[in-house]
């Protein structure tokens, strides 16, 4: 098998790897022995295994944590739904632009968080991470999928593109959409970046997640459709914000040890795992209580109560 390796001088060199089975004195197979020999007539690029397009696609899905963009889609669709409920026409084109801008902002937040968690050492010393990427960051740097500099570049490009895509939204909806986007950018970037490190501020990080992925994003989506800041859209985002905050909150539990060692004072670190368990129940319950209250007081149709069935699952 041919591949490239890093020598003691940190140079990439082309190699041939020979693997042979090893046996004990009685002839039983007990393992394998690998011998690496340098190939002198080829370059590292010629011997490096080819990576398929699907593998590359999956790699970038991991780096940018694309499956978690649902946390952006839900409040944006909710805001558009509220606009429709209030009698405003909904433009699918503007909805698509809003989703694109929000997704770029979310990707920039994900990758910048990975970069600064790497710089602080939080993700590097975290051995309780999940394979699903729910906690411990995307692990893209730790797995060698991309360099720290590469992640920082992806974050910068994503944030820059979100600003460019946001220009037509500002032209259509006015300066209020700029302030909402700017708030989302700053709170996303400085969630783990110094000097603010919002995620280390004993609950401020969790609060900002709930606000951004709940009321503010829903209100911003409705603002693009209507040109108005609708209180109903803000209210519709409250249960969504509680649920997104709950997802982040519960996945801070396995990060407790590494977060504590690096001074990342999340609510789990601040309260301790035992007391913090009640916080998850409170967030989850608050989401469904808020739905019930807004349906009962007439803010939203009584059929909204059907959403309570999701609590069973």
Where are these regions (language model features)?
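PAS/PAC sensory module
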Residues: 2-4, 9-18, 23, 33
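PAS-family sensory domains
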Residues: 27-39
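Membrane-embedded alpha-helical segments that form the functional core of polytopic membrane enzymes
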Residues: 87-112, 179-187, 231-250
